Amino acid sequence: MANNTLAFNTTVSIREFGFDSPAKFHAFAQHDFQHAVPEKESYKFRKELFKPVLYWLYSDDAKKEGLYLTGPAGSGKTSLPEQMAARLNWPCLTVSCNSRMTVSDLIGYTKLKCDPVTGDQTTEFVPGPLTICYREGFILILDEYDYLDVTTSAGLNGIFEHKPLVLDQNEGEVLKAHPLFRVFATGNTAGLDDESGLMSGTQRQNPANIDRFMTLKCPYMELGDELNILQSHFPADPDGRETFPTDVLIKMVEMANEIRQQYIGNPDSNGGSFTFTMSTRSLIRWAKKVIMCKEIKSEDPIVDALDMSFANKLSSVEAAAIQQIAKLKFG
């Protein structure tokens, strides 16, 4: 399809993002790429992150740089651009990076195609996620960017500046960037250093590559915001009654924050003792497993669910410490 197929042709209210304001933003009406638009999910947009990301999306800077979101596991780094795309109806592809990934993996590959009548064989180019996003104007999210080998990330330098992309796999086609192409990267590290020493598999990236990003820190949410996220997974019943007691959810969020404070990877932990932390993702899983444990008539639904969703991943010493915190918190 032509590069100009995808274009801003409607507006979306900022209320779609949870903010009370008359402001509206350019967005997309129905298009041929609906299959690539992320599903809209419950998400708490934090103003301090939402505003700079939104500004960047519509700015000329987005044609000269990528946007790197860094923060602890499960803090909403990847969900932020995905859920913004969902509300703007902007097609978006997320790629999970790894140390063996190459630029060719992102560009695409050539396969043999056999004519069913004549038996003649021809080659056909199958575009990869980068090629699709570059050509059509999608958002590309390179998740866990700091897992990439430095030779691969260096090979991507040109795309952050919207330079022409040469498709060697497609007979040397020179592909110009769609003006709406945007690229995000996410990582537990900011690409240059793992201060905790706990992020196994991450690679120190080349400074010249990381210099091509605007970088934002994505910490865990405030207690009240995280509580709202939990509550959104357990809406009231038709009679308006709670399906999950709020006082229990509050204690769960408080416990998650206690664990984070004692996490070795937390720069403010003052010598913490835990080698694993409880993310918002783990917190949601814990709450859902509490419901499951109640339904199967578990002896202690809260502690058993905590084991299933979090503590069983830890060493016996750390698991015992987690269970002790739970007993003190929940009785």
Regions picked out by a protein language model, each given a short descriptive name:
Residues 1-331:
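C-terminal regulatory/interaction module of P-loop NTP-utilizing enzymes
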